[in-house]
Amino acid sequence: MTSELDIFVGNTTLIDEDVYRLWLDGYSVNDAVALRVRSGILEQTGATTGVLQSDTMDHYRTFHMLERLLHAPPKLLHQLIFQIPPSRQTLLIERYYTFDEAFVREVLGKKLSKGTKKDLDDISTKTGITLKSCRRQFDNFKRVFKVVEEMRGSLVDNIQQHFLLSDRLARDYAAIVFFANNRFETGKKKLQYLSFGDFAFCAELMIQNWTLGAVDSQVDDMDVDLDKEFLQDLKELKVLVADKDLLDLHKSLVCTALRGKLGVFSEMETNFKNLSRGLVNVAAKLTHNKDVRDLFVDLVEKFVEPCRSDHWPLSDVRLFLSQYSASVHSLDGFRHQALWDRYMGTLRGCLLRLYHD
């Protein structure tokens, strides 16, 4: 009597998400085993500590072999050694390039060089993130920067194409690349209240409106470099505060429009000229690299802190900035409306994001 037996052979690579997270977080095999034991996995599965140790080591070996492919994610999709379902490939890539908020705040705006890498020991101690994880995150930032810094086209699209990241994560990396390239200061004490999300929001606005790519999508380094011609032209805005008649008329237009609508009207009326000088002088100084780097320091010093000290609610800040920007269009002696809109459209969005405790 003969019997038929169907045999299926599979070699799908198994990915344990919890172990992958421990590996990404920089834990050693022994530390990972201890954490898995603490989670109650032995009771749940009936396994022994020896089996758990072996399982963890197997996963770590797999992740180590996958890491070189994760450095160039399209290679992971096209390799034939590991049979990994597409959904798992996406998870591996996305989590490998995910970063800690506390870590990115320490390196945002710094040069992605060996000098900064030497500081990772201190950053690890300060943030409580393992040194191994800090190195992975820093190397990811540097790798993405090196690949896309010279490319034409949309920064976000280039990152997505070469690293297969989700739209949100690609936008975050675009902000990191943009800040590293322009070396914006983010570490000063008065900026510590700002989150990475605050800076990333502003980066996206600046990329959309202040870069070379905002006016010409065929320009090299389209979304990475600020438009130098635009920054030079911003000096023309100085007339708004240098010309006393224009300054007085601007103030009159804003006060007339906001009387009875602003809870802090008297404070606004008293400080209008100082606030306007602050915002216009920030623009006029952006021809110098140092002043570009200090943009966020200046915005907090010249606008956020004065308004905060007078207890402006966010709703009043929004009303003021809207009217302050729009009223310029009624100044007959002013000839740089398009330049003003390009500057203030972005600045208004940034200031509203920066204005919080």
Swiss-Prot record:
InterPro entries xrefs: FIBP
Principal localisation: nucleus
Keywords: Acetylation, Membrane, Nucleus
PANTHER family xref list: ACIDIC FIBROBLAST GROWTH FACTOR INTRACELLULAR BINDING PROTEIN (PTHR13223), ACIDIC FIBROBLAST GROWTH FACTOR INTRACELLULAR-BINDING PROTEIN (PTHR13223:SF2)
GO molecular function: fibroblast growth factor binding
Example of a GO cellular component annotation carried by this entry: endomembrane system
Keyword Oxidoreductase (UniProt): no
Keyword Heme among UniProt keywords: no
Organism lineage string: Eukaryota, Metazoa, Chordata, Craniata, Vertebrata
Topology in the lipid bilayer: Peripheral membrane protein
UniProt organism field: Mus musculus
Protein's recorded name: Acidic fibroblast growth factor intracellular-binding protein
